[in-house]
Amino acid sequence: MRPDYTLTDRDFINPDTIDLYGNTNAHLLTAPPAAFVLEFPGLGGGSCLGGCMDVGPYNGPLSGFLAERGILQVYTFPGPWSWMNRGAVRMIHALVDAIREKYGFTRETPWAVMGGSMGGMGALIYTANGDPAYTPTACLAHCPCVDVLDRVYCKENIPRTFFRAVADYEMPIAEALKTISPICRVEDMPHIPYHIINDLADELFPPEQMDAYVEALRGKGHTVTYHRLPNCRHGELTGEEWEVIRTFLLGHLVK
């Protein structure tokens, strides 16, 4: 530690420590990447899109596909109960800075955020951060929770995670939860392309809440591709939808 004990975010998250804050597909790249994707974890640290918080190379369902096309993929570690709270946003900002520095990316370099369940909600809430320096090129959310206040008690072990996510906010708990609830942040969403996936047999988050959220986004003039998957339970995807995900990412990341 420095003699004066001063530390900055970069002392923790920098080009040399990226692998401690996210698993990447860098080992699969055959040339310097031209774009990047950040994937956010679901509750507990895993992901219905393939990620795992065990530190190591990322070999998820999209890792090789993206690497072959010059796209760095990073499965981030903002915390298994974070729900993209302000601490998670700060960590992701620092990680974006480190990635840009390591790979020589500029603010014009295309990048996307994505995730499923808590990670899908995280992708939406992170996109609403309000700082143009950290506004992604595109956002993909699979089966996200979009109405936190309504779904706090959707499962016995869920309330503690929401409480922990915003426990240090100096405001009433209901107001704090609104800051991480997508339906309450529609006004803050930037005008970028969105792809949102709704599992119609979802046992945690009612499909009609997603319908209302997408309608609200479109009502504000946002470009949203919206797929409703019949018979899919929470976190499930069809083979056809995986292909749609690949097409969406390539369409916005490859020039």
What are these regions (language model features)?
Residues 61-83:
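Conserved alpha/beta-hydrolase
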